[in-house]
Regions:
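Glycine/GP-enriched mid-protein hinge/lid loop-to-helix segment characteristic of carbohydrate kinases
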Residues: 2, 16-20, 27, 38-41, ...
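Glycine-rich phosphate-binding loop and adjoining helix at the ATP-binding site
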Residues: 28, 37-48, 52, 58-60, ...
Length: 154
């Protein structure tokens, strides 16, 4: 199965088509700078541009640089304060007319490591640290995510 994987970051928005079984990129990665200010409307315009770039009409898996609970942005992170309490998955779905699956960027990076990478079949605790515009973390115990750890916010 293929999905458009997208990473919304504090300085750039990146996307590529991904094989969900292997985690391999099927397309070249495309990057557009995160708009300043990174308001919901401005970011949604870049997300739409990404979807159009790939001529994509199916679901999008999207990582987001802050705490996300059930698709809702809890903190604004490195983005505009306007993001706080936005139901991000529905916002992008309405703006782009495709389903969106949204989660914290570091949690998703960790999920990739647990599923396909260095953490595969590891028992006990596995901690994944991401460093970009901000610092993120994904913590797993026996392969199960402990969501929204956000040690970069301590």
């Amino acid at each position: 199965m293929k999905i458009l994987g997208m990473d919304i970051g504090g300085s750039g928005i990146k996307a590529a088509i991904v094989d969900t079984k292997t985690g391999e990129l099927i397309s070249d990665r495309h990057r557009i700078a995160t708009p300043k200010p990174a308001s919901p409307y401005a970011v949604a315009q870049v997300v739409k541009e990404m979807i159009n770039h790939f001529n994509w009409e199916k679901a999008v898996g999207c990582s987001f640089p802050t705490t996300i609970i059930d698709g809702k942005c809890i903190h604004s992170g490195n983005l505009s304060e306007e993001w706080k309490n936005v139901q991000v998955d529905d916002y992008f779905k309405d703006a782009c007319n495709v389903p969106f699956y949204i989660s914290n960027d570091a949690d998703l990076a960790g999920l990739a490591e647990i599923t396909l990478g260095a953490g595969k079949r590891k028992k006990g605790l596995v901690l994944v640290i991401t460093i970009g515009t901000g610092i993120g973390s994904g913590l797993f115990y026996n392969g199960k995510l402990i969501p929204n750890l956000e040690i970069g916010k301590l």
